């Protein structure tokens, strides 16, 4: 479900960016609301990740790269989906902010925190980490 949710957030964000770029006067409020909502949801999910990672790190040797970038902790298809979703979020955010700088479109750059948070959630729930040496 985490992969589907990550792609769903990416799609909602990208679909809100298109009208905001075409008609910034009327559609920028929706883009702003979507961006802030996804950022806040990402922050909350990130806190859950940190709590779960702290609990799991008692038994497993976990690193930041393995938790949030799935380095060595997730199968290739999972990496491609979750990191792919994160990359699309980054591209949409940077593109929107670059095409109309110094506007509320810059708030889109906060959105990729949710993609990163879904990577973290997947890894702390399902990731493969070596056991911690006692």
How should each PLM-predicted stretch be described?
Residues 1-41, 82-85, 90-98:
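Long, highly hydrophobic alpha-helical transmembrane signal-anchor segments
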Residues 107-134:
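Alpha-helical transmembrane segments and their immediate juxtamembrane interface regions
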Residues 20-24, 53-60, 100, 124-131:
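Perimembrane helix-loop junctions in membrane proteins
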Residues 44-65:
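Membrane-water interface of transmembrane alpha-helices
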Residues 63-88:
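Short membrane-interface loop/juxtamembrane segments of multi-pass integral membrane proteins
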Residues 98-105:
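Transmembrane helix interruption/hinge and helix-loop junction motifs
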Residues 17, 46-49, 120:
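Structural signal for membrane-spanning alpha-helices in multi-pass inner-membrane proteins
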